[in-house]
Every structure is written in C-alpha cells, then in structure tokens.
Amino acid sequence: YGPDDPVKIEYISQIPNMKSIVTAVYDTPVGEVWSEESINALKKTTLEHGLEFSVIESVPVHEDIKLGKPSRDRLIANYCENVRRLGKAGVKVICYNFMPVFDWTRTTLAKKRKDGSTCLAYDKKDLLKMDPINGEFSLPGWDESYEKDELKKLFAEYENVSEDKLFDNLKY
C-alpha cells in the first residue's frame, strides 16, 4: 500500500479478516535515510485504519552498493539506519530485493486465471521482445526512475560485474 495506490487504505481495511498491510515510504530517494516523521505518519495512518504496522515492502538497495562503488559505505550506513528506525517503529519484517537495476520483473500485473481471478505473472517471451535501452523499457511495476541515458550507463557498469562479483558486493 502507498498513498498513491488506486485502492485506498479505507477500502483495504474493510476486507474481512484483513489484519495487516505491507507498505513503504515512497517519497525518499533511494539510499537516503527515511525520516522518523515519514515512518511514524505511515504507522499512524495504518493503525488508524485498524491494521498492524509490522511489514515494510522494501528499503531499496542503492545500485552503488550492488556495483561496489566507493559510496557504498555511506549508503550501507543509511540502510542500517533505516532498519533501526523501522525496528523502533515496530516493524518486524523488511522485504528486500538485491536484483540489479529493475528491482523486480513481471510482464503483467493482472493475468487472468481459470477461476476469473488475476495474479502477477512473468513471461520470458514478452520480456525478450523489449529493448530497455533503445526501445520500450516499461514493464508493470517498474518505477521508471532512470532516463534512457542513465539506464544505458547503468547497464554498461553492470557489464563488468559478474555474478560472483555481485555477490561479493552484497556480502560486503
């Protein structure tokens, strides 16, 4: 849940047996420390709607950490401070994703199932049709925080990062 979601917390809280909500602070740049005011405002809104505030969807991991750049020490310290602040606010679970560049990949957010319900889905064939640098690079859920020039530069930086190097950078 976020304040800009089409389904408002007022409606989510009306779902039978709904006890908690997964949310995040969305107005702070990746790598920066989330303000206690933002965290507490999110907690207040959640609790006011009768929901538990115990799970955060993501504290994004800055690309400089994944790439092993010199700025990673400051960014890791900021990440740790976010974890401390969330713990102080009562958060027990922080979901994270260390996937380079796009955070997560789905090709559709509403794949129709046999029973008429919908779910998130990934189809490699759909993904392979896209060219994120020279053509279309929008997939459901991507925040599109990179301009094409920035994306091209980031892809070039990752060309020199093997799977082992990425894991070394994450273990650092």
Give the ranges of each region predicted by the language model.
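Active-site beta-loop-alpha junctions enriched in small/polar residues
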Residues: 1-3, 23-28, 58-61, 98-101
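Short, acidic/polar
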Residues: 2-15, 42, 74-84
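Conserved, mostly hydrophobic/aromatic
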Residues: 12, 21-23, 46, 86, ...
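Structural motif
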Residues: 15-16, 89
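Structural preference for beta-strand elements that scaffold enzyme active sites
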Residues: 19-22, 50-55, 92-95
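Glycine-rich, proline-tolerant flexible connector loops at the mouths of alpha/beta enzymes
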Residues: 24-40
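An N-terminal, globular interaction/scaffold subdomain
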Residues: 35-54, 58, 75
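Active-site acidic/histidine proton-transfer and metal-coordination neighborhood
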Residues: 65-172
